[in-house]
Amino acid sequence: VLLFLFLVLHHSTAVKEHDALKKEIKAHQYYSAQLFGTHESKGYWPAECAFSERIIKTLTECGIEWSVIANSHLSRTLSDYPIKYGTGGVMCDLPNKADQVTTKGNTWFSAQKDARGGQFAVPYCYLPYKSKYIDPETAQEYKITVVPMADYESYEDGYSAIGTSLLDPIVAGAPTSLRPPLVLFAHDGDNAWGGGSSYYNESVTGFSHAATTKGIVPSTIPQYLKDHPVPDTEVVHVEDGG
């Protein structure tokens, strides 16, 4: 079982003040150690997956080495992000040009469920990177590994059993990637189907076995990062949001 760091209360991490966020993370570490006897997790799950580069300093000071982010907040920073309106398109503010980087996604695919979806660059949006924060008062740099959850695929996975065909666009779009893409399923499991016994004991098991027969390797975040370390030079910008 992989344990994540979380908060004592359900806050939007991205807007919490440094000292308050640090106190909550430390409290979670303390209570986790009391419950499980130790707390060795180096990973962080921000509530609602709401992340901001402004919290990187706090996370590193708490001994956190990596955090989950939403992969839509990588895709929306790319200079060739394809704006799409209506079903499966942008249903929130358009990407802020201040967040735009010169990098291009080049290979894109669009997907939606229940009219909600997005545009994702492959393999860019399915690879862990480094992200950094520079303290404006001291100019000190803080860096952390960011691990993108698969927004669209997680939504599908959270509501019904899925097949490995869901991964086909990602596999097809990443034949020359130096690191294999990581498709991270993460969702509000208890809010839908993806959190009960049939999900964990049947769907996850069946999907994992089917993926293995196609040469896809089931893994955990720590194992992936150990097998495929993120180069310190692979620094990206992450758009604020969840």
What are these regions (language model features)?
Residues 53-68, 200-214:
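Short, surface-exposed basic-aromatic patches at helix termini and helix-loop junctions that form
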Residues 53-54, 76-78, 194-196:
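Extracytoplasmic/secreted cell-surface and envelope-processing proteins
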Residues 65-79:
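His/Asp/Glu-enriched short active-site or ligand-binding loop at hydrolase and phosphoryl-transfer sites
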Residues 83-152, 161-242:
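Active-site and substrate-binding clefts of carbohydrate-active enzymes
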Residues 1-48, 142-157, 180-186:
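Metal-dependent polysaccharide deacetylase catalytic core of the NodB/CE4 family, i.e.
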Residues 13-16, 75-84, 230:
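Short, charged, surface-exposed secondary-structure boundary motifs
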Residues 22-32, 56, 171, 204-208:
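Generic structural signal for well-ordered alpha-helices
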Residues 7-9, 43-52, 72-73, 222-225:
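Short, solvent-exposed turn/loop segments enriched in Gly/Ser/Thr/Pro and often Arg
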